């Protein structure tokens, strides 16, 4: 049975650092008040709660000042070649990075401000979160002849 948003929200109270727990709650409230889908809210919480737990009781999100601190957490998502021959962990790693970047962009640009203060498209990404995504080297399951080019797509989709 899949975990519900309500169940994930209930896990916020178990974050070992009260400051981090409060920040995760505030981010959730921000997402909810801006009409973000429940799935997006849930996915954001599913990343930030484990990240807060990883930081432990003595480190707050405000203490994060280097890429290495974030990379150490992200690298816990890596799997060895035997466990994941297709390197699907890279997709998870990148997904976690997207959500962590969003959180820190919210924290440093929007938290505690009027909802209309700065549009999210103009938020600045803190330098310590400017981490490049990993590229997968998985081979495509499609042959060269099975991939459509632009002209073929336009015959089906007329816009």
List where the protein language model places each region.
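N-terminal DNA-binding module of tyrosine recombinases/phage integrases
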Residues: 1-33
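N-terminal core-binding DNA-recognition domain of tyrosine recombinases/integrases
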Residues: 8, 25-141
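A general boundary/transition motif marking the beginning of the first structured unit of a protein
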Residues: 15, 39, 144-145
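Generic alpha-helical segment signature
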Residues: 17-21, 44, 66-67, 146-149
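Amphipathic alpha-helical repeat elements characteristic of tetratricopeptide repeat
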Residues: 21-25, 71, 150, 154
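Long, amphipathic, Lys/Arg-enriched alpha-helical "connector/arm" segment
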Residues: 130-159
